[in-house]
A protein has these predicted regions:
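LRR N-terminal entry segment and analogous cap-like coil->beta motifs
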Residues: 2-8
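Glycine-rich hexapeptide-repeat left-handed beta-helix
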Residues: 11-261
Length: 261
């Protein structure tokens, strides 16, 4: 292990393996850094563990956070309207085999595996982001995943969930496979969205016990709740345009005529 260029190491910090610390970094308290490179202003404290990973830039990693499996944490300000916000990973958050960049926030008991999380996106509470070696989950802009929500990639080609803009996945919702959430989308309750490809855009709320599967486009002020189902079969694409509320036991398996207008 080697430290230089203004690195400060204090407290009971352990630096092991082939670790390199340089460029005004600060490691203190009970931090353990193993086979990792930490540089350019990172501040790491409390009981953080970092294995086999890279941390670069002005960020704060604290609490009992764990970063491992060749994760890359690359902090950068100035790419969003909030110039002051620092990238932070804290509480009991765990980040594995992922890239966390810009000003993203990972905290609570969140678990992030095989993901690319950028801009000011947030994962917190007991949320789970679960990609795989083939497909990384992608969160960007001001997307949020929280509560007990799960966002999961599939193993097929393009089975990549992408959460954009101010979209949110919350409560006990599950979003899986080739799903794109764009402007003002909330998936909550016990809803299941399983693509795909699925596109949700422009003020779409999916909640209750509702379910969306197959090739589905839902856009423009649509609410799906209760036990409602939108399901596409055999290469068909179901397209639902609002304003519309789909509730009760309603089931849509083909494009409503009004949806074509």
């Amino acid at each position: 292990a080697i430290a230089f260029g203004g690195a400060v190491i204090s407290g009971n910090t352990r630096i092991t393996g082939t670790s390199v610390l340089w460029g005004e970094v600060y490691a203190t308290d009970n931090v353990w850094i193993d086979n990792s490179e930490i540089s350019q202003g990172a501040y790491i404290s409390d009981s953080v563990t970092i294995h086999d990973s890279l941390v670069y830039g002005q960020c704060r990693i604290f609490g009992h956070a764990l970063i491992d499996q060749h994760s890359m944490i690359v902090a950068a300000q100035g790419l969003t309207p909030d110039h002051q916000l620092l990238l932070q990973i804290y509480d009991r958050a765990r980040v594995s085999a992922s890239r966390i960049v810009h000003q993203a926030q990972i905290y609570g008991d969140a678990v992030v595996r095989y993901a690319f999380i950028e801009h000011r996106a947030e994962v917190f509470d007991f949320a789970s982001i679960e990609g795989n070696e083939e497909n990384n989950v992608w969160l960007c802009d001001c997307a949020k995943v929280y509560g007990h929500a799960q966002v999961k990639a599939g193993i097929e080609e393009d089975a990549i969930p992408t959460i954009h803009y101010s979209s949110q996945v919350a409560e006990y919702a599950i979003v899986e496979g080739n799903c794109v959430l764009k402007h003002h989308v909330l998936v909550g309750g016990n809803a299941v969205v399983r693509g795909g490809p699925i596109l949700l855009d422009e003020h779409v709320v999916i909640q209750g016990e509702s379910r969306i599967t197959g090739a589905v486009i839902i856009e423009n002020h649509v609410e799906l709740t209760d036990h409602a189902v939108v399901e596409a079969f055999d290469g068909d694409t179901v397209h639902v345009r609002g304003p519309k509320v789909i509730n009760g036991e309603e089931r849509i398996t083909r494009t409503p005529l009004a949806g074509l207008l």
